[in-house]
């Protein structure tokens, strides 16, 4: 146990160790976003497919699967934030006065990584409260008749109407607006973050740099377009209403 503790302490106290933590957790979160987007886009297939998908997620491992994954997600996000803040503090402490001018050369995305990251973290908390915990203005999602007893083929009892919950949630303009702004910040964060992951893993070279930058930007735009298509379709074009 002491050996494990010593190893973990050595990783955390090392700049390289913290960079690896940021890269590994970042890669996990990047892959999660792709999977989460694919699942979210099922909403366009209608109530039955989306509610069947939601029912499957909430009944994996007899209901424990979704919560185990959420705990892993929270741990990954927490480590990602803590390691990034620690690295930022170390870099600022070690920076010489004349090096401050170098930030002018940096991209907007790289200079706003901390701000965009913390805003995204705040959005994550709000998103969980809204669609998972269903607290505050979303409390009715657990009690109103329209969200209860949706009938699925092969399921004896009625299930929660997650599709209707999404439609009603994004029908509120300020919820959709906050969601779109958060996705814009996420896109900015990803465009620099994905490149940093490649660099930390030693996969970025002069020859591959342009391609990695292109892939990072393309992935960020794909994620942004996919996620915001849902509130825009509902709020602007009246999908599902």
Each PLM stretch: what is its role?
Residues 1-241:
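Membrane-embedded alpha-helical bundles that constitute the cytochrome b-like, heme-associated redox core
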């Amino acid at each position: 146990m002491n050996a494990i503790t010593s190893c973990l302490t050595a990783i955390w106290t090392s700049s390289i160790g913290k960079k690896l933590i940021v890269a590994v957790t970042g890669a996990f979160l990047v892959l999660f976003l792709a999977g989460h987007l694919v699942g979210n886009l099922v909403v366009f297939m209608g109530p039955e497919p989306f509610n069947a998908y939601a029912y499957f997620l909430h009944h994996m491992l007899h209901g424990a699967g979704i919560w185990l994954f959420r705990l892993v997600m929270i741990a990954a996000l927490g480590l990602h934030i803590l390691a990034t803040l620690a690295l930022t503090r170390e870099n600022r402490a070690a920076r010489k006065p004349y090096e401050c001018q170098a930030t002018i050369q940096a991209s907007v995305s790289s200079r706003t990584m901390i701000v965009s990251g913390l805003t995204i973290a705040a959005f994550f908390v709000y998103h969980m409260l809204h669609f998972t915990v269903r607290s505050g203005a979303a409390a009715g999602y657990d009690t109103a008749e329209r969200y209860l007893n949706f009938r699925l083929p092969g399921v004896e009892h009625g299930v929660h109407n997650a599709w209707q919950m999404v439609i009603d949630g994004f029908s509120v303009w300020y919820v959709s607006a906050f969601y779109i702004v958060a996705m814009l910040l996420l896109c900015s964060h990803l465009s620099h973050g994905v490149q940093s992951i490649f660099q930390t893993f030693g996969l970025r070279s002069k020859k591959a740099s342009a391609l990695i930058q292109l892939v990072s930007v393309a992935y960020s735009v794909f994620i942004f377009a996919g996620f915001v298509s849902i509130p825009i379709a509902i709020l602007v074009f009246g999908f599902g209403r």
